[in-house]
């Protein structure tokens, strides 16, 4: 496994030099709705991506239709592979599994892999589950606990560093948490 730190432009040039074309993400399928799903869908639409959301809860679907009028909202169970096929999972550029159940998210992500979805992201609440599925073809496993812990750690470090005239803006954990990359705001 290789980890690279570079600007977006440098990464594009790097992959082009290797002959690996990085396709732009245009169609994103989000499975499951919560605060993160709404925020993500809003940001993706702002970036001119088409967003399709599948959600079990009818009331949430109605609310999303009002909040995200340009998104396609589907009332249904995203763990139903027939529904995913009907909704064109094979033509999605990315699938994001954000239900409240780790197992459902992992199953959807693995099914997306069989459908050759180029980018697959699944949210898990238990770090042990993230470790179990590593290497199974899911591009990104996002641990809710790790993201929260990183945000708190970043805040604490920013408060500590503010005395020394530099604030930590962003904290990234890489290589299974063995490496940290910090983005600082330096004041003159």
Model-found features: residue ranges?
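Cytosolic regulatory regions of ion transport systems
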Residues: 1-188
């Amino acid at each position: 496994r290789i980890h690279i730190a570079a600007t977006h432009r440098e990464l594009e040039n790097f992959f082009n030099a290797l002959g690996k074309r990085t396709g732009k993400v245009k169609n994103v399928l989000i499975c499951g709705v919560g605060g993160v799903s709404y925020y993500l869908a809003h940001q993706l639409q702002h970036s001119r991506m088409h967003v399709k959301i599948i959600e079990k809860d009818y009331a949430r679907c109605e609310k999303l239709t009002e909040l995200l009028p340009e998104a396609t909202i589907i009332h249904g169970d995203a763990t139903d592979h027939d529904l995913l096929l009907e909704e064109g999972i094979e033509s999605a550029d990315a699938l994001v599994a954000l239900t409240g159940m780790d197992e459902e998210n992992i199953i959807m992500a693995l099914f997306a892999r069989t459908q050759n979805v180029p980018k697959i992201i699944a949210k898990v609440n238990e770090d042990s589950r993230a470790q179990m599925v590593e290497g199974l073809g899911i591009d990104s496993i996002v641990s809710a606990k790790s993201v929260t812990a990183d945000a708190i750690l970043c805040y604490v470090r920013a408060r500590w560093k503010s005395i020394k005239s530099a604030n930590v803006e962003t904290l990234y954990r890489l290589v299974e948490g063995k490496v940290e990359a910090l983005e600082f705001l330096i004041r003159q």
